[in-house]
């Protein structure tokens, strides 16, 4: 669980060994500094690339003169300064401090794997796949935030650098990164006006209507509440008599906040015009209830109970829906700590295995699922250790519990909890595959003196080869998914396939099951796309030095790019068909986030493979994604309108660059 810290501790101990006095040779002077060091007036060295360029992740060029490059030096200087300023929203002094902090953090992390430090090949632990430090474009006073290689923000940052260095469009690259940052760091509900705390009031009838939506939606996706216990708790909060008010409850408040999020998009009319970028986002609905919930939690912060834990988990989900993934991840860490303090990983001694024990199990494994998915998306260390055993939350005990569950029943050969089982199995397999693939590439990279794995195809191939072999395990998982939980396709096409075949809508299945089918398949495609995406060579040397904007048809054998593209296009096609033919995803923020994540991958493929035979399908996929963004915007997702704008700008830039290619 804490292997990340062990490596750094080993590095510190090796740095304190007796040979330390001779481990710092005198810096070799150079006759001419590289372009970046000259522009920023810092000392350069004779490394290739030099230490400063390695630290910043920029391409090191030496000896360029006026007219040698397509862009004049003033433009290069402007793009370099723009890159140092992140999304160009920080003040100069703030960026300088952030740059120094970033340099110090990166230098200390890489000192342990400097090629000159040891004459022999370094051990695998001395090279770790570097992430990216990104300045938050929303919270401009924040420190640069680190995102690991599995993060979609890490991939977005690589696209930004490519747009800047290869296409000469730093403004477009910064706009892309800035918008993607807003998908994980939107203004927190805590930052809203405190006056809103007293503005929101709901009658008992309104609250009960909202709670009825909960049993049809989140309860079937995040099964952490016992329906009977919750309803009994809710009734106990009301004083007898007409006009009575409800006593405070953090759990009830956060559940109501989630239901307000859900109902806001549900009740939005699809016939309205595109939402203005400054309009209120439906995902921020219920923020006054969220704020009140957090104040109640703070008041009782020393009280441990299952209700407190359930409140933290629902708060993390609320923040995730509000595009506050970083804040959601922090709240999730508090929830995991609370669950550990309550002893959820252990079976209470002397207590029978009854409904309460089953509820504790469901809560613990829900935390495992959320941690696996969210940490993978953000490229952060997992908060909970891997689990290689068998989890069965839909067994005979749960069948007895489900008989009393509100608004939910069995269907065919499954219960409503089987979806939860399959999500656990899938995310557990994916996080293990991701970790091993990174380790294999790191082991291969440690035997070379290079600093960028994207300039070492053999090291990348080690990880990609393992991913290809691991797909057999994921295919075996898909075959074991019950038929009732699979999303059927027209024709003789297997579920979880990337084939571009229309879906077969089962209108007779209950709504909760229809939604579970769609969300499970979207989860599968999103995770597999995330496995392959770090291995896409966005800005290799051939792409920079050639006249084309990326590798031509001879490079289309890049299997990682094609695999990521296929799963991205499958995601876009599924979301679009479901949005246009049903109401299942109208109020699910994750569907919008999946679509934007897939669109990033498709745009990245088009940037580096413009002449590829698959580029036509990729171009069509971006057009379909824009149609989905239009629908999302009509249902209250303010970020969807900006996603359309960014996607169209990138479309035009790619088409313009392709039209200028020679031949």
UniProtKB/Swiss-Prot annotation:
GO MF assignments: DNA-binding transcription factor activity, RNA polymerase II-specific; RNA polymerase II cis-regulatory region sequence-specific DNA binding; zinc ion binding
Give start-end positions of Basic residues composition bias: 55-64
BP-aspect Gene Ontology terms: DNA-templated transcription; positive regulation of transcription from RNA polymerase II promoter by galactose
Name a single GO cellular component: nucleus
Query: What domain of life is recorded for the organism?
Result: Eukaryota
Q: Which Gene3D superfamilies match?
A: Zn(2)-C6 fungal-type DNA-binding domain
Record field: compositional bias (Low complexity): 73-88, 105-125
Disordered: region residues: 1-28, 55-126
> One Pfam family for this entry, by name?
Zn_clus
For bias type Polar residues, the affected ranges are: 1-20
Q: Which residues form a coiled coil?
A: none
Phenotype upon gene inactivation: Abolishes the production of terreic acid but not other types of secondary metabolites.
Q: Which UniProt keywords are present, listed alphabetically?
A: DNA-binding, Metal-binding, Nucleus, Transcription, Transcription regulation, Zinc
| UniProt DNA-binding residue ranges | 34-60
- Any transmembrane segments, and where? none
Functional summary from the UniProt entry: Transcription factor that regulates the expression of the gene cluster that mediates the biosynthesis of terreic acid, a quinone epoxide inhibitor of Bruton's tyrosine kinase.
PANTHER family in UniProt:
REGULATORY PROTEIN GAL4 (PTHR47424), TRANSCRIPTION FACTOR ASQA (PTHR47424:SF12)
Listed name of the protein = Terreic acid cluster-specific transcription factor atF
Which gene carries the instructions for this protein? Answer: atF
